[in-house]
Amino acid sequence: MKVTSLDGRQLRKMLRKEAAARCVVLDCRPYLAFAASNVRGSLNVNLNSVVLRRARGGAVSARYVLPDEAARARLLQEGGGGVAAVVVLDQGSRHWQKLREESAARVVLTSLLACLPAGPRVYFLKGGYETFYSEYPECCVDVKPISQEKIESERALISQCGKPVVNVSYRPAYDQGGPVEILPFLYLGSAYHASKCEFLANLHITALLNVSRRTSEACATHLHYKWIPVEDSHTADISSHFQEAIDFIDCVREKGGKVLVHCEAGISRSPTICMAYLMKTKQFRLKEAFDYIKQRRSMVSPNFGFMGQLLQYESEILPSTPNPQPPSCQGEAAGSSLIGHLQTLSPDMQGAYCTFPASVLAPVPTHSTVSELSRSPVATATSC
């Protein structure tokens, strides 16, 4: 089986009501772009940067490529479960042959060919989402912010009718649902989840750990609250806060409480803290911690820098298991202090580690004394 290119007109024909059930559309754009606007009925393939680097254009497990369990089970049935076509798209590429090796679309196409050898045909959309949206916007879900004009028109209706107009406000996917349980006392979610007192009450949350740029104490007046200001940037130092975050979570646990860890979207910073907690307290390897959390909140995707810091953290806190260095890593690591770290990594993570930029993998300074911790830019209650 091979990849076949198709244009927007052909995809539109596939998406006709009577044919839509036999077509699966996989959107390989970043999650936030997908959440804002997408082909109606499509699924987002949210491949983590570590998975992409490790794959190097090769195949990965079907659970990464087909995150929706129902769609995955259907496609993996004999004969593709009645699906005739799987269409892969990115932002705007015109030729699948020219896709970069580390691109999500390239990895998805390769993986589909490997896991669906006798199943539905695999297509690549020429021109990507940009072109398709410009030609057939009626086939897309376009989420736009509420404009000032719309607000004014609603106010006018209120004044004319004497009663408010029901406004169904849109919430992006990362704010939908509620916080997810990582452990019986540890929950993960977004800033929106943390602001909804009914969510917190229903889950018996007693503490909030906010890992974002802005402090928000909407529901914090009756909860234990800790704020760790961290930018979602590959240059941000989040590892220096691992231990204080772990101590706060443990303090809540020891008192029989429950803590919600959140950032803005619950995609990068707060999952990083939860992974560090699992690695420290449950002795999970990074891959195990990532998969464990991904199964519970599918859109998690820590940035390059945070994954690099987690890899370094793994080598510091978990028993080292010396392994021979892969030849491909020797050149990059030559003369570098990273050799010691590389030898302690589990074999399936060594390839991913070697592909990180040196600037990301440079040792991150950590606080080692109580006096140093007191100088960190953390706003927190005096106790947990």
From Swiss-Prot:
Protein name in UniProt: Dual specificity protein phosphatase 5
EC number, as in UniProt: 3.1.3.16, 3.1.3.48
Family matches, as PANTHER family: DUAL SPECIFICITY PROTEIN PHOSPHATASE, DUAL SPECIFICITY PROTEIN PHOSPHATASE 5
Organism: Homo sapiens (Human)
CDD domains in alphabetical order: DSP_DUSP5, DSP_MapKP
GO biological process: dephosphorylation; endoderm formation; ERK1 and ERK2 cascade; MAPK cascade; negative regulation of MAPK cascade; peptidyl-threonine dephosphorylation; peptidyl-tyrosine dephosphorylation; protein dephosphorylation
Active-site residues, as the UniProt record annotates them: 263
Domain Rhodanese residues, every copy: 19-141
Family per similarity comment: Belongs to the protein-tyrosine phosphatase family. Non-receptor class dual specificity subfamily.
One CC-aspect GO term: nucleus
